[in-house]
Swiss-Prot record:
Stretches in topological domain Cytoplasmic: 1-86, 108-162
Protein source organism: Takifugu rubripes (Japanese pufferfish)
Protein name stated in the entry: Caveolin-2
GO MF annotations in UniProt: molecular adaptor activity; protein kinase binding
Keyword Lipid biosynthesis: no
One Pfam family recorded for the sequence: Caveolin
Protein backbone atom coordinates (compact mmCIF):
# COMPACT_ATOMS: atom_id res chain seq x y z
CA UNK A 1 0.00 0.00 0.00
CA UNK A 2 1.81 2.76 -1.30
CA UNK A 3 1.22 5.89 -3.16
CA UNK A 4 -0.07 5.39 -6.69
CA UNK A 5 1.15 7.88 -9.24
CA UNK A 6 -0.81 6.68 -12.29
CA UNK A 7 -3.84 8.61 -13.52
CA UNK A 8 -7.01 6.67 -14.09
CA UNK A 9 -8.96 7.26 -17.29
CA UNK A 10 -12.66 6.65 -17.41
CA UNK A 11 -14.80 6.93 -20.53
CA UNK A 12 -18.21 5.87 -21.74
CA UNK A 13 -18.41 4.41 -25.20
CA UNK A 14 -21.77 4.54 -26.97
CA UNK A 15 -22.66 3.55 -30.47
CA UNK A 16 -24.04 6.34 -32.61
CA UNK A 17 -27.33 4.47 -33.00
CA UNK A 18 -27.80 4.27 -29.23
CA UNK A 19 -27.03 7.96 -28.91
CA UNK A 20 -29.59 8.91 -31.57
CA UNK A 21 -32.29 6.71 -30.03
CA UNK A 22 -31.80 8.32 -26.65
CA UNK A 23 -32.24 11.83 -28.10
CA UNK A 24 -35.21 11.15 -30.42
CA UNK A 25 -37.99 11.70 -27.85
CA UNK A 26 -36.53 15.07 -26.89
CA UNK A 27 -36.22 16.22 -30.49
CA UNK A 28 -39.68 15.04 -31.47
CA UNK A 29 -41.24 16.97 -28.58
CA UNK A 30 -39.44 20.14 -29.61
CA UNK A 31 -40.48 19.71 -33.23
CA UNK A 32 -44.13 19.54 -32.21
CA UNK A 33 -43.84 22.69 -30.11
CA UNK A 34 -42.44 24.87 -32.89
CA UNK A 35 -44.18 23.52 -35.98
CA UNK A 36 -45.15 26.29 -38.37
CA UNK A 37 -48.59 26.70 -39.89
CA UNK A 38 -49.01 25.08 -43.30
CA UNK A 39 -48.49 27.35 -46.28
CA UNK A 40 -51.94 27.86 -47.78
CA UNK A 41 -50.59 29.69 -50.84
CA UNK A 42 -47.51 27.66 -51.83
CA UNK A 43 -47.49 28.94 -55.42
CA UNK A 44 -47.91 32.57 -54.32
CA UNK A 45 -50.88 33.15 -56.63
CA UNK A 46 -52.35 35.81 -54.34
CA UNK A 47 -49.23 37.92 -53.85
CA UNK A 48 -51.13 41.06 -54.85
CA UNK A 49 -53.47 40.61 -51.86
CA UNK A 50 -50.72 40.90 -49.25
CA UNK A 51 -51.59 44.50 -48.44
CA UNK A 52 -50.57 46.22 -45.26
CA UNK A 53 -51.52 49.57 -43.77
CA UNK A 54 -48.42 51.26 -45.19
CA UNK A 55 -49.34 50.02 -48.70
CA UNK A 56 -52.70 51.82 -48.54
CA UNK A 57 -52.12 54.85 -46.31
CA UNK A 58 -48.86 56.76 -46.64
CA UNK A 59 -47.96 60.11 -45.13
CA UNK A 60 -45.23 62.11 -46.84
CA UNK A 61 -42.39 63.49 -44.76
CA UNK A 62 -43.89 67.00 -44.91
CA UNK A 63 -47.25 65.96 -43.41
CA UNK A 64 -47.23 63.63 -40.43
CA UNK A 65 -50.07 63.04 -38.01
CA UNK A 66 -49.49 62.40 -34.33
CA UNK A 67 -47.73 59.10 -33.61
CA UNK A 68 -50.63 57.81 -31.53
CA UNK A 69 -53.06 58.58 -34.38
CA UNK A 70 -50.85 56.73 -36.84
CA UNK A 71 -50.49 53.71 -34.54
CA UNK A 72 -54.22 53.68 -33.75
CA UNK A 73 -55.14 53.98 -37.42
CA UNK A 74 -52.78 51.17 -38.32
CA UNK A 75 -54.15 48.91 -35.58
CA UNK A 76 -57.75 49.73 -36.55
CA UNK A 77 -57.05 49.02 -40.22
CA UNK A 78 -55.44 45.65 -39.51
CA UNK A 79 -58.12 44.65 -36.99
CA UNK A 80 -61.05 45.56 -39.26
CA UNK A 81 -59.39 43.85 -42.23
CA UNK A 82 -58.84 40.72 -40.13
CA UNK A 83 -62.38 40.66 -38.69
CA UNK A 84 -64.12 41.27 -42.02
CA UNK A 85 -61.99 38.66 -43.78
CA UNK A 86 -62.81 36.09 -41.10
CA UNK A 87 -66.51 37.05 -41.13
CA UNK A 88 -66.83 36.92 -44.92
CA UNK A 89 -64.91 33.66 -45.22
CA UNK A 90 -67.08 32.16 -42.49
CA UNK A 91 -70.22 33.10 -44.41
CA UNK A 92 -69.05 32.60 -48.00
CA UNK A 93 -66.20 30.07 -48.07
CA UNK A 94 -68.25 26.87 -47.98
CA UNK A 95 -70.89 27.98 -50.54
CA UNK A 96 -68.19 29.42 -52.81
CA UNK A 97 -66.15 26.21 -52.54
CA UNK A 98 -69.26 24.20 -53.43
CA UNK A 99 -70.08 26.39 -56.45
CA UNK A 100 -66.46 26.45 -57.65
CA UNK A 101 -66.22 22.68 -57.21
CA UNK A 102 -69.30 22.24 -59.41
CA UNK A 103 -67.99 24.72 -62.01
CA UNK A 104 -64.53 23.13 -62.22
CA UNK A 105 -66.06 19.66 -62.26
CA UNK A 106 -68.30 20.61 -65.20
CA UNK A 107 -65.42 22.32 -67.02
CA UNK A 108 -63.18 19.29 -66.51
CA UNK A 109 -65.90 16.97 -67.80
CA UNK A 110 -66.52 19.15 -70.87
CA UNK A 111 -62.81 19.41 -71.58
CA UNK A 112 -62.15 15.69 -71.19
CA UNK A 113 -65.23 14.32 -72.96
CA UNK A 114 -65.97 17.02 -75.58
CA UNK A 115 -63.15 19.45 -76.29
CA UNK A 116 -60.26 16.99 -76.52
CA UNK A 117 -62.04 14.43 -78.76
CA UNK A 118 -63.21 17.18 -81.12
CA UNK A 119 -59.71 18.70 -81.16
CA UNK A 120 -58.14 15.31 -81.92
CA UNK A 121 -60.65 14.76 -84.73
CA UNK A 122 -59.82 18.12 -86.28
CA UNK A 123 -56.10 17.42 -85.98
CA UNK A 124 -56.63 14.18 -87.90
CA UNK A 125 -58.50 16.06 -90.66
CA UNK A 126 -56.18 19.07 -90.83
CA UNK A 127 -53.47 17.66 -93.12
CA UNK A 128 -55.95 17.14 -95.96
CA UNK A 129 -57.70 20.46 -95.27
CA UNK A 130 -54.29 22.16 -95.21
CA UNK A 131 -53.56 20.99 -98.77
CA UNK A 132 -56.92 22.32 -100.01
CA UNK A 133 -56.50 25.62 -98.12
CA UNK A 134 -52.99 26.15 -99.50
CA UNK A 135 -54.30 25.60 -103.05
CA UNK A 136 -57.15 28.11 -102.55
CA UNK A 137 -54.74 30.62 -101.04
CA UNK A 138 -52.22 30.21 -103.88
CA UNK A 139 -54.94 30.52 -106.55
CA UNK A 140 -57.00 33.45 -105.25
CA UNK A 141 -55.65 35.29 -102.24
CA UNK A 142 -51.94 35.50 -103.09
CA UNK A 143 -52.44 37.06 -106.57
CA UNK A 144 -55.00 39.51 -105.17
CA UNK A 145 -52.64 40.79 -102.49
CA UNK A 146 -49.66 40.91 -104.88
CA UNK A 147 -51.64 43.11 -107.29
CA UNK A 148 -52.92 45.31 -104.45
CA UNK A 149 -49.35 45.69 -103.18
CA UNK A 150 -48.06 46.73 -106.60
CA UNK A 151 -50.91 49.19 -107.13
CA UNK A 152 -50.65 50.80 -103.72
CA UNK A 153 -46.84 50.94 -103.70
CA UNK A 154 -46.88 53.67 -106.36
CA UNK A 155 -48.84 56.05 -104.13
CA UNK A 156 -46.70 58.86 -102.77
CA UNK A 157 -47.72 61.08 -99.90
CA UNK A 158 -46.26 64.55 -99.50
CA UNK A 159 -46.87 66.81 -96.56
CA UNK A 160 -46.51 70.54 -96.55
CA UNK A 161 -46.58 73.08 -93.78
CA UNK A 162 -49.43 75.37 -94.77
Amino acid sequence: MGLEKEKLECSIIMDEDEFNRSIEPILSKKARLYSSAPDRDPHDINAQLKVGFEDVIAEPASAHSFDRVWIGSSATFELVKFIFYRLLTTLLAVPAAFILGVVFGVLSCIHIWLVMPVTRSFLMLLPSIQVVWKSVTDMFITPLFHSMGRSLSSIQVRTSDT
